[in-house]
Amino acid sequence: IRRQRQMCIRDRLSGRKISLKQRSTMQEATAAPQMGGIVRLTGFILRITALFELAGAALLLPTFCADYGLRGIWYALFHSISAFCNAGFDLLGTEGAKFVSLTRYAGDPLLTTVIAALIVFGGLGFLTWEDICTYRLDLHRYRMQSKVILSATALLIALPAVLFFLTDFADLPIGERILASLFQSVTPRTAGYNTVDLTEMTDASQAVTILLMLTGGAP
């Protein structure tokens, strides 16, 4: 199946005709509701993925290059892709203590905002993004799935963030406290990054974090 998906992508990029079997594989890989329009949807997925990941890397570049020199280019690209794909992998544990994740950048508004945004954008799913790009603010034309995903995402970010702000991170300056609260409400569902020591969070916040992990992201 993996080889078939790679062949589909190769043929799509090269402009070759996509067979019925390949279209079926593409439908399965993208969780599309029907086979019709699957080639166009796959092209859209490739374009929007490249757009977000390259834009994210460009925004992360100043921070990582300032800390790691030319290696920062690779770090920016890697973490942008990892965040958008909701993978949660990082390269920062090789620079000191293990399992540090993004704690070094807890007070960096640019990096934490970009990473959090990439996680959210990647977690919405491509069918939701197709609705957003096609219908813009005409929300009543969105698929029901997209409406549910957007509403649930907003609630699952806002409510835990308020809880975390009220119960945790009291020792941080107000700006960092807001950043940490928002970041920790975004990342548990799909990515797994952290900018604070999770063991120091209250029991209630840890329980909410576990529930967010169980919830996950959109198809």
Task: List each model region and its residues.
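Membrane-proximal intracellular helices of multi-pass ion channels
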Residues: I1-P219
